[in-house]
């Protein structure tokens, strides 16, 4: 489906809606901001929307709440990694965004990168790090600088830019404190881009690319969400042909992972103009600093209209009629 300005969506047709926010991950604070923004947008359009925080409320209450569909505004583990999607499949409650497998794949950076590489999509070279890894050998193979990060965290949490070999151990330990799997990837020196995608399969399409200009090129957790020093360029100022190339790469990355509904591809652009995929976010931020609403606005779509269309596309991996029912 194409996302449009001023969609004709009857709020009553959406039924009773749960907005899942907060949760238990390291990105809880951002999820609360996203979820409250989504909740306010839905209520402003007359939707019968209610907050639900899995970090504070037992899952039994989710099952008993009588939601007809849910908007997943959770970020990170237990919300973006396939676990919540699997629970909602079991409950037969349609939900926004990607299904169980695509969510799990996209949350795991090494699985994502291996799949993209198999399909010939450009992504930085990488190695998995463990306590007994020969870090000097990794540096010799991949070169410096390197990015060391947890394989299953987002929002740059636990990430370190390593510029000297003797920094590897500390960078590994920082990331390993958050995830048993740690990834080191070649640092791409160039422009940071992001590109939202909406739809599914052959109907998937990219929204405008955003170019990110962060203070001292450091687009970390603080600069992503809590400062006004980062510049976001949308239109991206890229040449038209390069903008189209980045959009096409983002859409193909989305399709290869089996994503649906909406997502956001993060991309690095080398100084000679070659785009490299970094990761796919299947439950993007919807805060005041978030990028998907910005790209939507560039297409003439308000925050509220975008949220309504994401919610209207809520579905299940398995059609409700296919769910097994006891005799």
Swiss-Prot record:
Pfam family, one: Dala_Dala_lig_C
Keywords: ATP-binding, Cell shape, Cell wall biogenesis/degradation, Cytoplasm, Ligase, Magnesium, Manganese, Metal-binding, Nucleotide-binding, Peptidoglycan synthesis
Pathway of action: Cell wall biogenesis; peptidoglycan biosynthesis
Binding positions (Mg(2+) 1): 266, 279
Reaction equations catalysed: 2 D-alanine + ATP = D-alanyl-D-alanine + ADP + phosphate + H(+)
Note describing how the cofactor binds: Binds 2 magnesium or manganese ions per subunit.
GO terms under cellular component: cytosol
Binding-site list for Mg(2+) 2: 279, 281
Main subcellular location: cytoplasm
InterPro entries (UniProt xref): ATP-grasp, ATP_grasp_subdomain_1, D-Ala_lig_Van_CS, D_ala_D_ala, Dala_Dala_lig_C, Dala_Dala_lig_N, PreATP-grasp_dom_sf
Subcellular location: Cytoplasm
Statement: the UniProt record of this protein carries the keyword Cell wall biogenesis/degradation: yes
Cofactor(s) of this protein: Mg(2+); Mn(2+)
Keyword Cytoplasm found: yes
Record: residues binding ATP: 139-194
Xref: Gene3D superfamilies: 3.40.50.20, ATP-grasp fold, A domain, ATP-grasp fold, B domain
Domain (ATP-grasp): residue spans on this chain: 113-312
HAMAP family linked: Dala_Dala_lig
NCBIfam families: D_ala_D_alaTIGR (TIGR01205), PRK01372.1 (NF002378)
Family: Belongs to the D-alanine--D-alanine ligase family.
Name of protein: D-alanine--D-alanine ligase
Gene designation per UniProt: ddl
């Amino acid at each position: 489906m194409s996302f449009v300005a001023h969609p004709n969506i009857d709020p009553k047709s959406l039924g009773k809606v749960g907005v899942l926010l907060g949760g238990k991950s390291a990105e809880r604070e951002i999820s609360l901001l996203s979820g409250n923004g989504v909740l306010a947008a839905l209520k402003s359009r007359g939707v019968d929307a209610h907050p639900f925080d899995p970090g504070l409320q037992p899952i039994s209450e989710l099952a008993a709440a009588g939601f007809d569909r849910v908007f997943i505004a959770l970020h990170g583990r237990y919300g973006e990694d396939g676990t919540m999607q699997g629970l909602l499949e079991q409950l037969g409650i349609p939900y926004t965004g990607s299904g169980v497998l695509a969510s799990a794949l996209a949350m795991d950076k090494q699985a994502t990168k291996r799949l993209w590489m198999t399909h010939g999509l450009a992504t930085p070279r990488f190695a998995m790090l463990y306590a007994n890894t020969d870090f000097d050998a990794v540096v010799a193979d991949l070169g410096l600088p390197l990015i060391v990060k947890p394989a299953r965290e987002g929002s740059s949490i636990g990430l370190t830019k390593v510029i000297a070999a003797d920094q590897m151990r500390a960078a590994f330990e920082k990331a390993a404190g958050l995830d048993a799997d740690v990834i080191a990837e070649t640092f791409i020196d160039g422009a940071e881009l992001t590109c939202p995608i909406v739809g599914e399969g052959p109907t998937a399409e990219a929204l405008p690319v955003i170019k990110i200009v962060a203070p001292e090129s450091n687009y970390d957790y603080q600069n992503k969400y809590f400062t006004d020093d980062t510049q976001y360029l949308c239109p991206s100022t890229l040449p038209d042909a390069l903008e189209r190339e980045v959009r096409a790469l983002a859409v193909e990355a989305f399709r290869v992972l089996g994503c649906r509904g909406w997502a956001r591809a993060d991309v690095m652009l080398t100084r000679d103009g070659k785009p490299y995929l970094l990761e796919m976010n299947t439950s993007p931020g919807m805060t005041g600093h978030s990028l998907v609403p910005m790209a939507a606005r560039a297409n003439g779509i308000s925050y509220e209209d975008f949220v309504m269309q994401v919610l209207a596309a809520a579905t299940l991996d398995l059609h409700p009629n296919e769910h097994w029912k006891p005799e």
